[in-house]
Amino acid sequence: FSDLDAQFAGGAVDIDLMETDLGLSATICAAGLDAQVAYGIPQFRRIPFCGGEMAYALSIVRQLCGHIGRKVAFTIDGEELTVDCLMCAVCNGRTYGGGFYAAPEARPDDGWLDVFIIRRVGRLTIARLLGMYKGGKHFRDGALTEQAKPYFLYRRARRVALRPADGRGPIVATADGECAPCDAVEAVLRPLSGRILLPAPAYERFVAKRSSVDVK
């Protein structure tokens, strides 16, 4: 996106958007541990000489030292379930949070949201799960991998609502980097309601991928 020649040589594409309680989102709306970490970073940045990775690391430490996980009630295209969860992500795009491949096979123009819920686990298991999640190793060929199945739930949907079900107050959520405590969060798909300009290489890949999907 920093190459102006490539930008002008590219093209515009239509993508799906999510309408959420935090505003319109083009990529991922998440709640739980990862959102709590992101929400806490600005507080540490106010400390002198504490910015960037240091603020991120301190926010993680604070979250891990506190109560981990929430009981959350989900309504996913009419399906209702209550889960003790570490965190969850409603995905229109593939990555967020500095390179976490939350939804390795998501497409922003296929008319679906990929929903991943990570069950609450002990502190010793969190690092392993986050490593799997960051590398996108929890999902392959349209399904959860065997190593992910004990810990992850997966759905495809067009409307997702969630609310805390443990009486502990609001849950922290994030959408495209905007964080806030919420009493409830809803994400509703708005098919092909956004348009973005892609630089030439990305535009060519996007069009080729869309063509291959249409052929199938």
Regions found by a protein language model. Give the residues of each.
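Glycine-rich, charged/polar anion/phosphate-binding loops
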Residues: 57-61, 70-77, 97-103, 144-148, ...
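Glycine-rich phosphate/pyrophosphate-binding beta-alpha loops
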Residues: 30, 34, 89-104, 178-179
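Gly/Ser/Thr-rich active-site loops/lids in small-molecule metabolic enzymes
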Residues: 45-55, 98-99, 104-127
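A short catalytic or substrate-binding loop motif that flags glycine-/basic-rich loops and adjacent residues
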Residues: 10, 64-66, 109, 154, ...
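Catalytic core of DAGKc-family lipid kinases
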Residues: 1-87
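ATP/nucleoside-binding phosphotransfer catalytic cores, i.e., glycine-rich phosphate-binding loops
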Residues: 76-77, 82, 107, 117-216
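Short acidic/glycine-rich loop or secondary-structure boundary segments that cap or lie
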Residues: 34-37, 82-84, 96-99, 123-127
